[in-house]
Amino acid sequence: MGKFYYSNRRLACWAAGKNPHLGGSVEQWLAAINTDPSFRQTVKEDVQENREQPTAVRMFSWKVGSGPIDNPEKCDWHFVLTGERPAPSRPVKADEVVVVPQPKKVVIPTPPPPPAPYFRAVGAFAPTRSEFVRAIVERLTRLREESRAAALFAELPLEYPQGAPLKLSLAAKFAMLKHTTWRKWYDTSDERLLEAHPGGPCLPPPPPIQNPPSFQERVREFCRMKSCTKAFALETSLGLNKAWVGLVDIPSTSVCCADGKTTGGQTIAQEADPLQHRISTSVAPGRAQWISERRQALRRREQANSFEGLAAQTDMTFEQARNAYLGAADMIEQGLPLLPPLRSAYAPRGLWRGPSTRANYTLDFRLNGIPTGTNTLEILYNPVSEEEMEEYRDRGMSAVVIDALEIAINPFGMPGNPTDLTVVATYGHERDMTRAFIGSASTFLGNGLARAIFFPGLQYSQEEPRRESIIRLYVASTNATVDTDSVLAAISVGTLRQHVGSMHYRTVASTVHQAQVQGTTLRATMMGNTVVVSPEGSLVTGTPEARVEIGGGSSIRMVGPLQWESVEEPGQTFSIRSRSRSVRIDRNVDLPQLEAEPRLSSTVRGLAGRGVIYIPKDCQANRYLGTLNIRDMISDFKGVQYEKWITAGLVMPTFKIVIRLPANAFTGLTWVMSFDAYNRITSRITASADPVYTLSVPHWLIHHKLGTFSCEIDYGELCGHAMWFKSTTFESPRLHFTCLTGNNKELAADWQAVVELYAELEEATSFLGKPTLVFDPGVFNGKFQFLTCPPIFFDLTAVTALRSAGLTLGQVPMVGTTKVYNLNSTLVSCVLGMGGTVRGRVHICAPIFYSIVLWVVSEWNGTTMDWNELFKYPGVYVEEDGSFEVKIRSPYHRTPARLLAGQSQRDMSSLNFYAIAGPIAPSGETAQLPIVVQIDEIVRPDLSLPSFEDDYFVWVDFSEFTLDKEEIEIGSRFFDFTSNTCRVSMGENPFAAMIACHGLHSGVLDLKLQWSLNTEFGKSSGSVTITKLVGDKAMGLDGPSHVFAIQKLEGTTELLVGNFAGANPNTRFSLYSRWMAIKLDQAKSIKVLRVLCKPRPGFSFYGRTSFPV
């Protein structure tokens, strides 16, 4: 496939052709792509996914500018859709044009274009509303330009001294010259325009010459100016050097939802009441003196006014707002915003420049129906318009600070309505919701108006992409009972913001700063008994952990006459090790005036079951402690979740496991909690729990020194299917508890730990979820899950000890003669070998009075005890629990995935742990010091060729038949097979291992049967019959059948693996499904019958587990 060349026009044509049901012209799609980079990327990814289609090749394989659709006036859609070029209707010579030399003419330059109207495509294309919005924006833009010109040359305020000479600066004179030039271009009396534009320019008529205003007009203007005195005084008192202020109504079009619709299927009434935005014109240099005098007069007036006068002017004082934040009981409920006045919230930067701040409502929408449950409404919101950003960017501002965010909920309906409503505000450009959380406000609709304010201190760059997602609002309810088509609430969002320059701190009044430091203004309640939640603290303490890899290079050096060699310079690593770090701190804890809150009695939510694990006082390694059946824990507890489970039937929950145990750093105990969903290892660990069994399934390490332990088990991710409320034959989720490293000191008595199971059991919509694994020869990408090596023990001795962990990770672990297949070794076995950097963790599972210093390196073929050579290897010091990264050392840059017969782990690459200092312990201690190594991934893996390409795998061989009439039944279980009338030999390959270490599988298999004969080729007779069936022999259905002569020696067929539920479990004929029968009428004459299988793309596996055999 050739190279594709992309442009916005080509992507717009592709989107318009793919979505004819949405309507809209190519130019409208082009406008959406130009203004939304994320939408452009989505269209580009769609083209890349369909790059094999002929239409995509014809549209994007041409260089930009020479394609069939690049010219908007001559788009060859017939060629794009059919690939046919129209035949010429006459000879080509007839189309040739003879160019006659023409005398040179003077080219009149084209007039400067008028300002382009600002508009943005909103949501899906709706011609009526978009044209309405565009017309309004164009009209307002034209009015704004005319108002600017009028303010520069005509309309001076009445306060300006009449009759005084107008002193213009040099900049004003240049502006007048520019205006005169502009009028010259648009003057239709200019004869040059008739030559350049025959018929006259299509331009609006020139504005009429303005006469001096009459007395009536001046009186009318005086009354209009008096109505704007308060707004004008407020603007000028803040130091905004504006020459003219007006009030313009702009429709509320700032509500933007993903894909033009809400995520919860709700609708937003965008035809909200118009918002009042102040639009200020450019600076008028000619009136700088008048503005300065006006500002000084207003400041003297403000200083003369008393505190009560200021409160009467602003309708709210800062102390009243602060009491509202703290939820004072004596606060008078009134319909006022919680945002304090600007002069009280901010301190001015200087005499001539005030803070660039706006306090107004920038989002106002009505809620039609309340989303419930998981049907949450998401609203994308940008608090700062592009015009405002561009205006302050021209002034040198580089960032925007959102200091205050107010959420106001005005409900509609009956008083006392217990319908709850929650609005959550997050930072839209943060992927981690814990860090993005700004605050949430919850109220009951029957409590009336509810307001809340937050101080996020959110700062983002002026160069932020123009996306409507700076603030994300989520609206949800849990018990809405009203009609979905009724308007339930009006939600308004206000911001208090300022624009700051590079290396400038934001300016905040001392009272606001003090309140923010104390944490008192981080929570707010004013009306409706609003419950407000917001994060506390902002400073991150501790030392950040940094690791910067500085890559090496190569150079050429001379080693002899006309001889050079390439010298590789190794890379260096700059790192800072973090010893203590807190993501968030509570700034209230250091305040001396605040007292610690007492412990309160509480109950837990979501508790579904509980169990007890008994631990002996002398708990040794490999000790089996007990098993908890998850289904029995929930049913025996008989709580609310079990009742919900009975009602739902099928659930796919995320379990939270909490194991409450007292912390003790003197025992050195480490346990393993293994999640065995299909009851594969229960019978293997009841006597002695070998770590190979317990670590082959999903597991978690529990350290006694850390105390109470918790984790989450995503049943849908680990199993890929739903869970029935009663026991089934193919799954039985259990938690096995075993001891990995025993205690050094015997405790006083046996004890117990409590296991709590939390879950929200909601109904699942289907039985199958996302597959755990989809077959692909190149499925291994270097990442592991639940890869833990068995414990490594060091003796208390002065001799330097060495312990190794092999890196032949594709080798199947064994316990005696039993092979234990697991998913990690299966994935690695898909490749011949691998290289890269091993990233993992070391857990020192010893009592607190044990200590050791380890040197972790990678070595090839043996060990190095020469210290001078050893410490030249790249390695990592380990003194406590922590992570490490070590590059795999090998003369081939890779290590094999599996071993040959007679080889050991140390013959290849291995991770070696040298005890260069220690281990040490107090006198009387004789127990060994154990460590546990976990491998997380191979960073930047260097993978070899796949073990097998897209080819057939040997599944099973049948030989030594004892009967002539033989029938072999092939069900859903492909890993193992047994027979009493012939010898069975199973093939070992990655596909068979994948089936072994999963609970269910489904897909299509291509089968190939091959056989050899005992007798001479020409003297044999008989046939091989392959029949496809559904169900069982007694009540099932017969499908197609293939008969092959025994002398043909091979045959092919296919088999759909799956049952009525979608996927087959690893059991034989337990569910209504498809299967296949192979019948032989002269089986003794066949020496070997071999069955090969080849999975087709999309063959899926569900439920991670292991298989000891």
Curated annotation (Swiss-Prot):
Family in the record: Belongs to the nepoviruses RNA2 polyprotein family.
GO molecular function terms listed in the Swiss-Prot or TrEMBL record: structural molecule activity
InterPro entries hit by this protein: Nepo_coat, Nepo_coat_C, Nepo_coat_N, Nepovirus_subgr_A_2A, Viral_coat
GO cellular component: host cell cytoplasm; host cell nucleus; host cell plasmodesma; viral capsid
PTM note: Specific enzymatic cleavages in vivo by the P1 encoded 3C-like protease yield mature proteins.
UniProt-recorded name of the protein: RNA2 polyprotein
GO biological process: transport of virus in host, cell to cell
Location in the cell: Host cell junction, Host plasmodesma
Chief location of this protein within or outside the cell: host cell
Superkingdom to which the source organism belongs: Viruses
Keyword line: Capsid protein, Host cell junction, Host cytoplasm, Host nucleus, Transport, Viral movement protein, Virion
Note, other: Virions are comprised of 60 copies of the coat protein.
